[in-house]
């Protein structure tokens, strides 16, 4: 069976989050691994329950890599990478919701890059929000 950790995270996504996670997975900025994209596409057929015999690792491998000899280590790596993306997505969603911390992080980065004018502009905006 596919990793219960990965399926546990995915099963808790709302339909909107699951769809958005698919966009996250397919974004070349966040993921360049085509196998991870294919695994997401395969798993979405089973959302949200993820209870099916077709989730056995050998069956998943056969569907993703038709005609190739089963390689547990390779499949586990693909599953692990999708799991890491799910964790990154959750962190990203949380980051987007927290305007204050997002602003503080932006200020740190602007300051580090010595972008004083832009820093002062955003500093004033953030100060007003506090």
Write out the residue ranges for each language-model feature.
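Flexible inter-repeat linkers and adjacent short helices
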Residues: 1-130
């Amino acid at each position: 069976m596919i990793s219960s950790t990965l399926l546990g995270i995915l099963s808790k996504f709302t339909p909107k989050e699951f769809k958005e996670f698919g966009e996250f997975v397919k974004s070349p900025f966040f993921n360049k691994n085509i196998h991870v994209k294919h695994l997401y596409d395969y798993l979405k057929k089973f959302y949200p329950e993820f209870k099916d015999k077709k989730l056995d690792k050998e069956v998943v491998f056969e569907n993703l890599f038709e005609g190739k000899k089963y390689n547990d280590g390779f499949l586990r790596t693909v599953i692990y990478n999708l799991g890491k993306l799910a964790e990154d997505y959750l962190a990203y969603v949380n980051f987007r919701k927290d305007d204050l911390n997002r602003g503080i992080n932006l200020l740190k980065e602007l300051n580090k890059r010595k972008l004083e004018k832009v820093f002062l502009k955003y500093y004033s905006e953030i100060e007003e929000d506090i």
